[in-house]
Curated annotation (Swiss-Prot):
NCBIfam families: rRNA maturation RNase YbeY. This is Endoribonuclease YbeY. PANTHER family: ENDORIBONUCLEASE YBEY, CHLOROPLASTIC. The gene is ybeY. Single strand-specific metallo-endoribonuclease involved in late-stage 70S ribosome quality control and in maturation of the 3' terminus of the 16S rRNA. One of its GO terms (biological process) is rRNA processing. HAMAP family: Endoribonucl_YbeY. It comes from Helicobacter acinonychis (strain Sheeba). The lineage of its organism: Bacteria, Pseudomonadati, Campylobacterota, Epsilonproteobacteria, Campylobacterales.
Length: 140
């Protein structure tokens, strides 16, 4: 189940994201928060001590029964910029970022694993007929 908190003026259809959430976490609730670039920088600075606006952050919650899996926070300003730059829709860019964030909530870590997140992300991109994600675009 997907719970959304759109803190931007943009109106979006969340149907694809709901399908992704149901596939990856069929019994758990996931929170999706859409924020401005300025808000993302503030979150990143306050919670990770990194003073810049990143594209997506994931905050898993403890594995306690009947609690949400966690939150995925997406920088809508950067998502819009990247969608235009890469020539695909904003909805597709958000879906790519959501998949990336969801995999982090599920314990994947592309900085430490042996390509497992990259492989799972590729499978999901094909399943949902999405363009290449950042993790795939920078692949060697």
């Amino acid at each position: 189940m997907l719970e959304t908190d759109n803190q931007t003026p943009l109106k979006l259809d969340f149907l694809l994201l709901e399908k992704i959430a149901r596939l990856l976490a069929p019994t758990q609730m996931v929170e999706l928060v859409l924020v401005s670039g300025e808000k993302m920088r503030e979150i990143n600075r306050n919670l990770r001590n990194c003073d810049y606006a990143t594209d997506v952050l994931s905050f898993p919650l403890e594995a306690i029964p009947h609690t949400p899996l966690g939150s995925v926070v997406i920088n809508m300003s950067l998502a819009q910029t990247n969608a235009l730059k890469l020539g695909h829709s904003l909805e597709n860019e958000i879906a790519l970022l959501f998949i990336h964030g969801m995999l982090h909530l599920l314990g994947y870590d592309h900085e430490k694993d042996q390509g497992e997140q990259r492989q799972k992300e590729s499978e999901l991109i094909k399943t949902f007929n999405l363009p290449l994600s950042l993790i795939e675009r920078v692949q060697d």
